[in-house]
Amino acid sequence: ALGKSGKEPVLVLRDIKTENYLGGSLAIARHLSDFCKEVSVLSFLGEKDTHKSFIERNIEENICLNFLTKSNSPTILKRRFVDNVDKKKILGVYSINDDLITNEEEDLFIESFDRLSKEHDLVIISDYGHGLITPRVAKHISKSEIFISLNAQINAANIGTHSIRKYED
């Protein structure tokens, strides 16, 4: 951080270094790929700014990507500004549309989930509260016959609005 601007009451930052990495469900898949023979990912990319080529270049060979398209959305991109001295996050800027997916997108997700879950021993659901897992999708997942491991996260974009309660026993 450089400090406060002399002209306006705003924080001024300087980008010294840039790092790009795969986060969210792709980070989980990459960790799992170290000790699992095969890992599948089912998620959404935005119809705008997909970043698909970056993802494909940086994903392990034993990870099978199954992407659906979320309409009127970018692929989620989180920029974080980190202080160069103490490595603490100063600011985050998210490119995101966390509106719920459409009914048609729900249908595609459920169809893909049913197909893929039959091919695997374990399903890990990472619900970041960004509109991809609707109450209808959560109810469908909850009724699955396969063992489900669930991670419902609270983050800066969903505090107070996201809960694990939408999943049934």
Q: Can you annotate each of these PLM segments?
A:
Residues 1-2, 7, 15-169:
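Ribokinase/PfkB-type carbohydrate-kinase core domain
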